[in-house]
Amino acid sequence: SKYVGSWKNDKKDGKGTLTWNDGSKYDGEWKNDVRDGKGTFEYANGDKYVGDWKDDMQHGKGIYFFHTGDRYEGSYVQGERTGEGIYYHASGNKYVGSFKDGKQEGHGTFTWASGAVYEGNWKDNQRDGYGTYKWNVGDSYEGEWKDNKFNGQGTLIQTDGTKYKGGFVNGMEEGSGIQEDKNGNRYEGFFKQGKKHGPFVETDKNGKVIRKGTYKMGRLEN
């Protein structure tokens, strides 16, 4: 490696540039032989970081340019994306929110290039907790999430006016729920893997019972 810059007590201190044998390069501030202050690091693979350093680690605010075209702007703690930031994907997707140890964690908004948007809780890069998802076509889901899927209690509203409120397991209606169409007709019953399953009551918009019976995996039994 090769260093060009200022020294203090035989240690790199002040401004200087260090070039490693693999081609990576740091240009910026040093303190007591380590990167500390403002600086730019160019990685051998083409990635680049511009921002704050402390104790030889990215720490504070910075911008990281990935050679893939992705970009991160935001907070760093001890070398990891931690705190508030924005991650721009080369694909056009974008995440604005909280990070922990390089992953989307806490509260954040993810916008897909398609126009779909999720706003809510994240854990370990996955939609987890409470959140709202809006499809680009206008459908929306608000409720509980686990492992990137609807899991728990939620409300699903479709553009045709159909509204479902109830339980979900792995992205599908499951357990007890109420489904209402745009005319106010209401189905109250149970679901399994997204299909009507079990005893139900159907009422019109005035609450008058239209039908009672039992479904078995989406098929009316009686």
Which residues does each predicted region cover?
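Glycine/tyrosine- and acidic-biased, solvent-exposed loop/turn segments at the edges of beta-strands
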Residues: 1-222
